[in-house]
Amino acid sequence: MKKVTLLFLLFLSISAVHTQGQNITFSHLTTDDGLSQFSVNSMYIDERGIIWIGTREGLNRYNGNDIKSFKLKKNDPNSLFSNTVLRITGNKKGKVYLLCTDGIAEFDLTTQRFKTLLQGNVDAIYYNEKLYIGKREEVFVYNESTGNFDLYYHLAGKDITLSCLHLDDKKNLWMGTTGNGVYCLSENKTVSQPIWKS
């Protein structure tokens, strides 16, 4: 009876896997395939299913078949302004945002052009309804109508560097730091003390 039960359970599990399974394929992308560089800093999948790959030698777009690389072109204002792409995010409405070593760039999927939004040192980037950036202990929000980054919050009296940002469903902005834990900023701008592992 045990054997019959085991065979029945095995049959059910195989049937369930077969009916729910998807064809998933995996490719190992290298410079031989067109990747601009082996060291990958960040990846992002846009609303069209395109994979964007940030490296130390430019931005790569992978459509499942081909890789196209975007790099700095001197004297071309529509090209990438910095080759080192550290982080990638997007608005799922035709814009891809890049944190580069020299600032923030925007790539328009429709026009296929880059726009430099901010030059200078930026430590973190995140998109959730708005583009948030972290510069040392300050968080800024991109104002699309003015083209400016407006101060959203300053962690007063703190000597920290923000490393990552995340906005949760309750509109709390979580701010990860390098060496100082995680801060939580509520929607009404109340900040909690650093969250440490106890």
Residues of each region from the PLM?
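Carboxylate-rich, polar loop motifs that coordinate divalent cations or form catalytic acidic clusters
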Residues: M1-S198
